[in-house]
């Protein structure tokens, strides 16, 4: 790889081919030399962006990708809540983070941003009406393999910060927007409900955010965030019932909406996950872990990100319209 010019900062984005990653890369490419480390080839990277094909679990590939790099955005992770081999969550999300931190420390990078998730902020015993980055949750409170792996990854970042490693942590909420085929859990949820004439739903509070605001927030956290601190990158709190109504208005599609209690949702998720694990080997429509997170969910505060970073997310309606427009017409005709 040719070294970056001395006047231009070389930046590595792991997971740069993903939903958030592609928007972050597009933003960074305006004034950085950007390199992507990902197993997937980027679908729409700006001209001049370098691509290294590989896994964050491969130390040799990671060292190659870190050549001449000054800043690292670590986004690479398995984002869904169901995969055939559950141990992959721990390997990619937790061990992959450790590999990246160890290699970046040896490289001597100036700053490292670890992209975590809001899902680990919802504890089983929390009595706070609003959740913020100050919340303290434990590994035992995590409802499944995904959240456990993400909590362990964040703990690795915090432990590294405690020993002087220049790492900042960002906790995005549920990003939506134009996805170009990157069907992340929030976008899959929108598609799931949009195509159904009868919508059975567990009502809960979620926080939706424009994916472009997440990208901008990651850059702000890298530039202005305090080492060893968390920053929640969210947008608007909205109930699923309200979201379904807004989606119906935007899409012009009528649907019968049927709320279901938490106990029924949990039983349905157990059955769906059993068949996914044992029979279909295909992601179920609901998982036990996702239902548990929904039942614990509360409004999220982004005041620290506003105050310390200058983070200013836009209203979510435009992103919601774009996300709906990105759903293939063949799916919407179901």
Segments predicted by a language model, with ranges:
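Short alpha-helix in the Rossmann-fold core of NAD(P)-dependent oxidoreductases
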Residues: 92-97, 113-116, 149-150, 207
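N-terminal Rossmann NAD(P)H-binding glycine-rich loop of SDR-like oxidoreductase domains
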Residues: 11-30
